[in-house]
Structures are given as C-alpha cells and as structure tokens.
UniProtKB/Swiss-Prot annotation:
Keyword Glycosyltransferase: no
Organism expressing this protein natively: Nitrobacter hamburgensis (strain DSM 10229 / NCIMB 13809 / X14)
Annotated localization: Cytoplasm
Gene: gpsA
InterPro entries linked: 6-PGluconate_DH-like_C_sf (IPR008927), 6PGD_dom2 (IPR013328), G3P_DH_NAD-dep (IPR006168), G3P_DH_NAD-dep_C (IPR006109), G3P_DH_NAD-dep_N (IPR011128), NAD(P)-bd_dom_sf (IPR036291)
Residues that coordinate or bind sn-glycerol 3-phosphate: K107, G135, S137, K190, D243, S253, R254, N255
Gene Ontology molecular-function annotations: glycerol-3-phosphate dehydrogenase [NAD(P)+] activity; NAD binding
Pathway(s): Membrane lipid metabolism; glycerophospholipid metabolism
Database matches in PANTHER family: GLYCEROL-3-PHOSPHATE DEHYDROGENASE, GLYCEROL-3-PHOSPHATE DEHYDROGENASE [NAD(+)] 2, CHLOROPLASTIC
Protein name: Glycerol-3-phosphate dehydrogenase [NAD(P)+]
GO cellular component: cytosol
Disulfide feature: none
Alphabetized UniProt keyword annotations: Cytoplasm, Lipid biosynthesis, Lipid metabolism, NAD, NADP, Nucleotide-binding, Oxidoreductase, Phospholipid biosynthesis, Phospholipid metabolism
A Pfam family assignment: NAD_Gly3P_dh_N
Coiled-coil ranges per UniProt: none
Length: 326
C-alpha cells in the first residue's frame, strides 16, 4: 500500500477545519478546501475560521478554492453535511485517482435513496475506496487537541489500519473496524435519538427520564443495526453507544439543543444544522424496510413533521404495553 501522506479535507466548516487540524497534528501534508473563494482567502490570510473562534489554524495547512488541487491527495476526507455529500463527492470525482480512500465524516442517511454515506461515495466516485469516521467527538474539542477517540471503518482491514495510522495521534485515537454498516447506523440513529433526549430535558421531565429515554433509544439503535447486518460490538462501541451518550447529554450537540428548544416550546436554534432532523424520515423508512420497530425515533419524526404534539408523543410512549426488556 502506498504512503498516505497528503490529506485533503473537503468542507471548511467547523468539523472540516477540526479534522484538518487532526491530520496536521499527525504530521500529514494537509489541504483544506472551501467552496467559497472569499472564505478560502480569508481563512488562509488570517489563519482563523469564524466557525471555530479562538482556535488558530495550523500554519502548515494549505487552504484552497481549487477543487482539482484538493483532489491531488492520498486521503480525502468529506466534511460536508450528509445531504450535501453526494454533490461534493461527484464534483470531486473527476480529480481523484483510482483507489484513493475517501472518508465520510457526516452522520446521516441520504434523503430519497436511504443510502449511507459510504454508499453515496461508492456511487458518486466508484473508482475510490469508501471509509467512514464516526464517534463521540465535537469539533471544538477536536480542534483544541483535547483527547478524543473515534471509530474508522473500511471494508478492507489493511486499509482501515493504514488510515488509522495516517490520522491518529496521542490526542485523536481512531479504532479500526471493517463494520461499515454498524458505524454508520450508530452515527445516523443517535442524532435522531438525541433530539428526543433534548425534548425530555426541555420539558423538565427529570434525569431519570433522560436516562430511560437514552437507554431505550439505544435498544432501538441496536435492533436496527443488527437487522441491517451490523456487529453488536460496533453498536456498543464508540460510534454507537459512545456517541449516543455524548450526544444525548451535551448542549454542544446541535441535535440535543434542538430537542431542548422544542421541549421548551421554542423555535429551533437559528443557523445550526441538525442532521437528526433530516435523517429521521430516512431512518424510519430503513427501519420499516427491515421490520424494526423504533417508537422513540418514530415520535421524533412525527413531532418534526407536525403530525404529533410533544405532549401526545410523550403520552403515547408512556402508555405503551409493558414488556420484557430487550
């Protein structure tokens, strides 16, 4: 396998900028691609990204608006929202050499197709090798170099190991797996479930209810994952349970914050993307296709679509028939 030294991150938002810093700290030659030329020029000149205030960009990172230049890399990291990933990968595809690993870092399922992000990469750039990076990680923590552990998956174990060694450091510790589906289901489902956890907090239903909701939500995540062929150890690992715990308990999570606002009867926080809101309908379609019941995720989707009030959703969940745990 060739040396994986040049890393390009596509997307100069908070997460993309944080991941560019990860690659730089790992000793790689890093390019950060911004779609907007003015944004690229400003970040390059000031070494500051307004999306990550107070965290200077490493001087070694090259910021560009040139997609062809960004494509000349040994590793590509796609750091755009899930629903924009296909467009980003398709635009980049003509500039990518055969066999280039392309790592998805968005947590979601594509609308309309029910495709996971590695499937989107496989379709939009079939000459490349899809991979996925996911786990309990906030952009601000990662950008500051605070200790973080994540999961990195690729179909080929040797490739997964090579990517881990290319991006890992003392502060950013990826664990490798070949279980793409498990990693992707964990990341997608936890965003939807975090909205429910936020609603519990916003409605002031108590810490006991929050713990119960998170645990029952995890049961839904596991049922769906196993039905889709995921491994149980992946679902109970960093990209599943680990990410769920973080996202269901921290106001840094946009999905959790959205739920808190909804629970308080407020409008959604402005200017903050909640992947869970976009993923909820696709997640339920996937669950239905696999014969999996997900009452908590279903309640979230119904609330977001305006089909059910929060109070009615809570009543529905609390009056479900008693059953054995599992």
């Amino acid at each position: 396998m060739k040396t994986l030294n040049r890393v390009s991150v596509i997307g100069a938002g908070a997460w993309g900028t944080a991941l560019a810093g990860v690659a730089a700290r790992a000793g790689r030659e890093v390019t950060l691609y911004a779609r907007d030329a003015a944004t690229a020029a400003a970040i390059s000149a000031t070494r500051d990204n307004p999306r990550l205030p107070g965290i200077p960009l490493d001087r070694s990172i090259v910021v560009t608006h040139d997609l062809a230049a960004a494509g000349r890399a040994d590793i590509i990291v796609i750091a755009v929202p899930a629903q924009n990933s296909r467009t980003a990968v398709a635009a980049l595809a003509p500039h990518l050499a055969a066999g280039t690993p392309v790592i998805a870092s968005a947590k979601g399922i594509e609308h309309g197709t029910r495709r996971f992000m590695t499937e989107v990469i496989e379709e939009a750039a079939p000459q490349t090798v899809p991979a996925i990076l996911s786990g309990p990680s906030f952009a601000d923590d990662v950008a500051r170099g605070l200790p973080t552990a994540v999961t990195l998956a690729a179909k080929d174990e040797a490739m997964a190991v090579a990517l881990v060694h290319a991006l890992g450091s003392a502060a950013f510790r990826p664990y490798h797996t070949t279980d793409l589906r498990g990693v992707e289901i964990g990341g997608a489902a936890k965003n939807v479930l975090a909205i429910a956890a936020g609603i519990v907090v916003g409605k002031q239903l108590g810490a006991s209810a929050q713990a119960a909701l998170t645990t029952r939500g995890f049961s839904e995540l596991v049922r769906l994952g196993l039905a889709c062929g995921a491994r149980s150890e992946t679902l109970s690992g960093l990209s599943g349970l680990g990410d769920l715990i973080l996202t269901c308990s921290s106001p840094q999570s946009r999905n959790f914050s959205l739920g808190i606002a909804l629970g308080r009867g407020e409008s959604a926080p402005r200017g903050k993307l909640s992947e869970g809101a976009f993923t909820a309908p696709a997640l339920l379609e996937l669950a239905a296709a696999n014969g999996v019941e997900m009452p908590v995720a279903n309640a979230v989707a119904a609330i977001l679509a305006g089909r059910l009030t929060i109070d009615a959703a809570i009543d529905n969940l609390l009056t479900r028939p008693f059953r054995a745990e599992g």
